[in-house]
C-alpha cells in the first residue's frame, strides 16, 4: 500500500517538471483551465496552476515503501 502525505512537502525538480509539462500538454490539447488567468500560453498557465496548488495529481515515490503525495484539496 504505502503512506499518504498531504501538503506541505517539496516536490523534486523532476517531479515538478513532469507535472507542469503534463498539465501544459493537456491544456494545449483543449483541457479546461482550472484557474482564472489572462495568460494564453499553456506552459505559463500550467505553471500558475502548479504554484496555486490546483492541479489534481498524485505523485508516487519509491522509498522503502511507496509514498503518495497529494497537494490539492478539492473538497
Swiss-Prot record:
Catalytic activity reported:
RNA(n) + a ribonucleoside 5'-triphosphate = RNA(n+1) + diphosphate
What sort of enzyme, by top EC class, is this?
transferase
Enzyme Commission number(s) of this protein: 2.7.7.6
GO MF, one annotated term? DNA-directed RNA polymerase activity
Q: Name one GO cellular component term.
A: DNA-directed RNA polymerase complex
Its keywords, alphabetically, are: Cytoplasm, DNA-directed RNA polymerase, Nucleotidyltransferase, Transcription, Transferase
Pfam families for this protein: RNA_pol_Rpb6
Cell compartment(s), UniProt? Cytoplasm
According to its UniProt entry, the protein's GO biological process terms are: transcription by RNA polymerase I; transcription by RNA polymerase II; tRNA transcription by RNA polymerase III
The record, for PROSITE patterns, names:
RNA_POL_K_14KD (PS01111)
Family assignment from sequence similarity: Belongs to the archaeal Rpo6/eukaryotic RPB6 RNA polymerase subunit family.
Record text on subunit structure and interactions: Part of the RNA polymerase complex.
Q: What is known about what this protein does?
A: DNA-dependent RNA polymerase (RNAP) catalyzes the transcription of DNA into RNA using the four ribonucleoside triphosphates as substrates.
NCBIfam families recorded for this chain?
PRK01099.1-3 (NF002208)
Task: State what protein this is by name.
Answer: DNA-directed RNA polymerase subunit Rpo6
